[in-house]
């Protein structure tokens, strides 16, 4: 006595579950990360916060803060020109961080290393929301 087990290809199963590369679940995860990250980035004019949904392609697995000074703000340290030693560096002059911290305004969550701090605070919440979304997409298929 024997039996035949017919299983769909793994890529097809992933597709049904929304788990394929650049799929619905990845897009949802990216959107949740971006939404939560907005509360942590520096906010003076709002340019960093506004650039996140514009520059990020949800589903790509990357959330982008697309302003020229994003790295400088994320480091949390004052940066000066290597040669000029001034915060107002010469054109095309490389900058380096010095041991002086930046000050952030408009909320206690804003500060240096926004992604790492957001991840530490919101990781479990984001993963739970993403898991619920994936289950809704699959109509409970993975629980059967």
Describe each model-derived feature in a short phrase.
Residues 1-70, 79, 83-144:
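Short, Lys/Arg-rich flexible segments
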């Amino acid at each position: 006595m024997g039996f035949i087990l017919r299983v769909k290809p793994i890529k097809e199963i992933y597709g049904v579950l929304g788990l394929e590369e650049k799929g619905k679940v990845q897009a949802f995860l990216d959107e949740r990360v971006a939404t939560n990250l907005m509360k942590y980035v520096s906010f003076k004019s709002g340019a960093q916060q506004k650039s996140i949904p514009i520059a990020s392609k949800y589903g790509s697995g990357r959330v982008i803060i697309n302003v020229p000074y994003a790295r400088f703000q994320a480091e949390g340290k004052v940066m000066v020109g290597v040669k000029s030693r001034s915060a107002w560096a010469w054109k095309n002059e490389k900058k380096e961080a010095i041991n002086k911290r930046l000050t952030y305004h408009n909320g206690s969550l804003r500060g240096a290393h926004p992604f790492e701090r957001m991840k530490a605070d919101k990781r479990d919440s984001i993963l739970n929301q993403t898991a619920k979304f994936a289950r809704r997409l699959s109509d409970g298929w993975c629980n059967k």
